[in-house]
Amino acid sequence: MGSGLVARIRGSYGTKLTLALVVVVVLSVGVGTFVYQQTTTQLETDVRADLTGSADARADHLDAWLSNARGQTQLASRHPVLASGNDTAITRYLEGLAASDERPDGVVAAHVYNTSTTTIEASSADAFTGVNPREQGAPFATDPPSFATTSDVVVAAPFTVPAADFPVLSVLSPIPGTTDKALIYMVNVNTLTDDFGQNVAGSTTTVVSADGTYVSHPDQDRVLTGHDGPSRLLNQSRTQPAYIDANGTVTAAAPVDGAPWSVLVRAPHDRAFALGDFVASSLVGLVLITIVSLSLIGVTVGSTTVTALRQFSRRADEMAAGDLDTDIDTSRNDEFGTLAESFRSMRDSLSESLTDAERATARAEDAREDAEQQRADAEAAREDAEAARKDAQETARALESAAADYEEALTAVADGDLTRRVDASRDHDAMARIGHALNDMLDDIETSVAAATAFSDHVSDAAQRVEADAGDAIDAGTDVSTAVDEISDGATEQTDRLHEVAGEVDDLSASAEEVAETVASLADTAGQAASAVDDGRQATEDAVETMDDVADDAEAAADAMDALDSEMADIGEIVDVIADIADQTNMLALNASIEAARTGADGDGFAVVADEVKTLAEESRDAAEDIESRLLALQGQVSDVADEMRATSDTVSDGRATVGDAATALDDVVSFVADTDTAAGEIRAATDRQAHAASRVASAVDEVAGISQETAAQATAVADSAATQTDTLSSVDDAAADLADRAAALDDLLAEFDAHDDTEPEDY
C-alpha cells in the first residue's frame, strides 16, 4: 500500500503540490510552535526576573525610606527645644518639622508624645494635641516600645485615626534630656507606595507585615486587613525573595531589611504574559498568512499548472484514443505553450501516420471488395493499420513516462539499446523539450525496429514455409511425372494390345471368309473371337481407369499449382508490406537524421543509429524488390504449368471418351459373336455381316491405337511439363532459401538493437 501511495503521489502534480504546501504549513506550524515555546519560556524567565527585581527594588526603596525616616527622626529628637518645656517653642518647632522639605516623604504631622501618660502633648496639627493614642488603638501606645538608649528609633505598626482618612504609621525616637517623652513622625502609609509605578500593566504593589496584615495597599480599605495570598509565599519572603504563579496571578515578594515587612508585586497572568499571547497571536497570524499565501499560490499558480497539465493529459488521452482533431491551442507563451506546440507537432506526425494507415486500410478494403478470397489479406492489412494506430497511441502515452539520464540513455541507444529513455522531467525548458522529442523519436525507432524484427521473423518463417511447400510441390511433381510415365507405358502397352486386337480382327475376317468352307470350325473361331473381344474390352476398361487416374492426378497437380500461385500472391503481398515498411523506416531514419542535426553535438550518437537504420531500410527495400521480381517470374511459370496440367487433363478426358467408344464397340462385337453362336443357320449371311463388322472393328481398333499413341505422346509432354515444373519449383525453393537467408541477415542486423517486441507476426 505504501508503494501504491508513493506511486499515486509521484503520478500527480497536484498531489505533489498539495503535499509540498502541507509540508510547508506543517514546518511553519512546527517552527511557530517552537518559537512560541521558546518565547514563552524566555518570557516566563523575564517576567519572573522583572517582578522579582521590582519587588527587590521596592523593598530596597522602603528600606532606604525607613533608614532616612529613622535618621531624620533621631536627628529631630535631639533638638534642645523639645526638652525645654516651652510649649509654644515646641509647637513652633514641630510645625517647622512638618513643613520642612527635609522631612521624610509622607510625614503628615510631628508630635511630642508622653510615654507615661500616653498623650500627645504637642503637635504640628492642633487636632492631635491632647489626644490619647491608646484610646485610638495606636500600636505604639497599646504596646509601648522600650528604648535602650536615646539613639533608638522604633517604627510602629500602622493604624488609623479619626482625624485622618488614611492609615498612618509612627516613627518614634526618645527625646534626650527627658525620661518619658518621644518625638513621633506620623506618616501617611499610602505615600510609601505612591512612587511605585507599574512595570507590568495592571500590576499592584503591597506591603505586608510579619503578622500577615497589609501595611500598604492601593485599596485603602484593604490596609490593616489580613493578607489573602498564599501563606507559603509570605513565609518565604520574610528571609528571601520569592515568586509564585497561581490562580491567574503572578506574585513576587522581597523582604524589607529595616522592618518586618515584605513587599509584594502582583500582576494578572494574562497581563504579565501579554507579550506571549501577542507572540502567539502573531505566530498564528503569520502561520495563517503563510497558509493563505500558499493556498493562494496553490489556487493561482498550482491550480493553473494542474489545470494545464490535466488539459494536456486529457488531450493526450484523446489523441491516444484516436481523436487527432482535438484542440491543443493555448494562449500561454511559457513552457506550457512550448509543450502545446510539441503536442501539435506530435499530433500532426501521428495524423500523417494514421493517414498512411488509413490508406493501407482503404487499399485492403478495396482488395476485399475485388475478391472475397483476399478478405484474409485485407483483414491482415486492417489489423496492421490498427496495430499502427495502437503504436501511435502508445507513442502518445509514452510522452507521460520518464526514463534515465540523457547521456547514459543516449550512449545506451548508440550501443543499440533502444529500450532506454531519457528523463524529460527537467527544470531546464530546452532540455525538457529535447527530452520529450528524444522520447518520441526513440519510441518511433524502437517500434519500427521491433516491427522490422517481427517482420523479419515472419518473412523467415514464410520463406521456410514456401521452401517446405516448394519441396512438397517438387515431390508432388515427381509423383505426377512417375504417374505420367506409367500412363505413357500403359498407353504404349495398350497400343500393342490394340495392334494385337487388329491382328485378331484380321484373323476373324479371314475366318469369316473360310466359314463357308467349314462350319465345324465356326464354333472355335467364334469362341476365339469372343475371348479376344473380352480381352479387348478388359483392356479398354483398364485404359479408362488409367486415364481417370491420369485426369485426377492432372487435376490435383493443377490445383496444387493454383495453391502455389495463391501462396506466391500472398508472398507478393508480404514483400509489398516489407517494401512499405522499408520506405517508412527510411523516412523515419531521415526524420531522425534531421532531428539529430537539429540537436547538434548531443545527437551525434543518435545520428549514427539513424544512418544505420536508413542503410538497413534501403537493403530491406532492395531485397524486397529482388524477391518480388523473382516471385513474379515464378508465379508466371506456375501459372503456365497449371494451364498445361489442365490441358493435359482435358486431353486425357477426350481419350477416355474415345476408349469408352471402343469399349462400346467391343460390346457390340460380343453381341455379334453371341448371335453367331446362336444362329448357326444363318452363318453365311452372318459371316458377311461379321466380315463387315470385323472391318469396322479393325478400323475402330486402328483409331484406338492412334488415340493410344496420341495419349502416349501427351503423357510424354505431361512428363516433360512435370519435369519443367520440378525445375521451376527448385528455383522457387532456391529463391525461398535466399529469402530466408536475407531475412536471417536482416534479423541479425536488427538483433543488434534491444527493443521491446510487442508486435505479433500475424499483424503483418
From Swiss-Prot:
Domain of life: Archaea
UniProt modification remark: Methylated by CheR.
GO biological process: chemotaxis; signal transduction
Membrane-crossing residue ranges in chain numbering: 17-37, 279-298
Pfam families the record matches: HAMP, MCPsignal
Swiss-Prot/TrEMBL keywords: Cell membrane, Chemotaxis, Chromophore, Membrane, Methylation, Photoreceptor protein, Receptor, Repeat, Sensory transduction, Transducer, Transmembrane, Transmembrane helix
Topological domain spans for side Cytoplasmic: 2-16, 299-764
Intracellular or extracellular location(s): Cell membrane
UniProt-annotated stretches for the region Disordered: 347-401
Primary location class: membrane
Coiled coil: none
Compositionally biased region (Basic and acidic residues): 347-394
GO MF annotation, one: photoreceptor activity
SMART domains referenced in this protein's UniProt entry, alphabetically: HAMP (SM00304), MA (SM00283)
Function of the molecule: Transduces signals from the phototaxis receptor sensory rhodopsin II (SR-II) to the flagellar motor. Responds to light changes through the variation of the level of methylation. Also acts as a chemotransducer.
Similarity comment: family membership: Belongs to the methyl-accepting chemotaxis (MCP) protein family.
Name of the protein in its database record: Sensory rhodopsin II transducer
Organism: Halobacterium salinarum (strain ATCC 700922 / JCM 11081 / NRC-1)
